[in-house]
């Protein structure tokens, strides 16, 4: 059984998807980066950025960050700390990925860096919650053995390199 067959659509209505496509707001995570991001732990974990209530940036490494599909990152939030306190449906999130060998190989420019900007949606139960847990790497599962955390999907709205140029890979 494919995941797409069991999960609800990630947009509210087909009209929302058509509108998003017309407006050009959907941004894909380049397929050439999927495996690099999904195997980033432990050497090249993604940094996740959110804004604190005082406006300062909260940046934290998340070994649980993974590509969920072409348009979404997923991560497991263990339920403690200031990032957890600031994550809610609609929270703006930055995913910062850096792997210098990708610059050397020519896959990514400027330091092997890709930045993704999007919006979070929280899952505390249901099929997406379970799918995120299922895909989670074992070291992260060990950090939450009682499964008290929650899943987060981040819908990518923009992807760029270090200079702010849209990713073109």
Name every feature range the model reports, one short phrase each.
Residues 1-169:
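Binding-site signature for planar aromatic cofactors or substrates
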